[in-house]
Amino acid sequence: MKKILVLSIMAICALTISAQLPNVKLQDINGKTVQTGEISNDGKPVIISFWATWCKPCLRELKAIHEVYPDWQDETGVRMIIVSIDQAQDVNRVKPMVDGFGWEYEVLLDPNGDFKRAMNVQNVPHLFVLDGKGKIVYNHAGYVDGGEEDIYNALQ
C-alpha cells in the first residue's frame, strides 16, 4: 500500500513538473536571446505555436488566428509566441514571411529543434496554451479549420 501511495505522489509531481515550460535558449527574429523558461505574461495566458515556413497547415492556422487575435488580446490579454522550427539554412525566410502576412506575433527561432524536442513536439503545427501561472492547459497537434474556437475556450 505504501508503494502505491509513493508511486502515486511521484506521478502527480512528475505531471506537475512536466506542465511547466522547459528552459531553452532561443533567439527572436531580431537576434535577441530569450530563455523559454522565463516566458510569462503578467498572469495572463500565453499561446506558443510551433510552425515552419514550408508547412501549409501551419500557415492556415496562423492566418486564422491572426483574424481573431486582436479580439482575443482585448478579451484575455493573451500573448502569442510562434516558434519557427525552420532549419538554419531556411531561417532567413521567417522574418519576410511574418512581415508579409502582417503578423504581430512574437517570433522565436528554433533551428536546432532544442525547444521542439524539450516540448515533445513531433510534427507541426503544434500549439500550446499556458495559463497565467505558466502551466500548460491546452496542447494540440495539427490544424483543422475552425480549431480557433478550442484555442479560445482554453484561454478562458
Name what the model sees in each region.
Residues I4-L15:
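Sec-dependent N-terminal signal peptides
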Residues A19-Q20, K32:
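Boundary of Sec targeting at the N-terminus
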Residues N23, D28, M97-G132:
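Short, internal strand/loop/helix patches
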Residues K25-P45:
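A short beta-strand-turn-helix
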Residues G43-V46, F50-W54, N123:
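Short pre-active-site segment immediately N-terminal to redox-active cysteine/selenocysteine motifs
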Residues I47-I48, M80, L127:
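Hydrophobic beta-strand anchors of alpha/beta hydrolase catalytic cores
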Residues R60-F101, N112-R117:
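Structural microenvironment flanking redox-active thiols in thiol-disulfide oxidoreductases
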Residues V129-Q156:
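Thiol-/selenol-based redox modules, centered on thioredoxin-like
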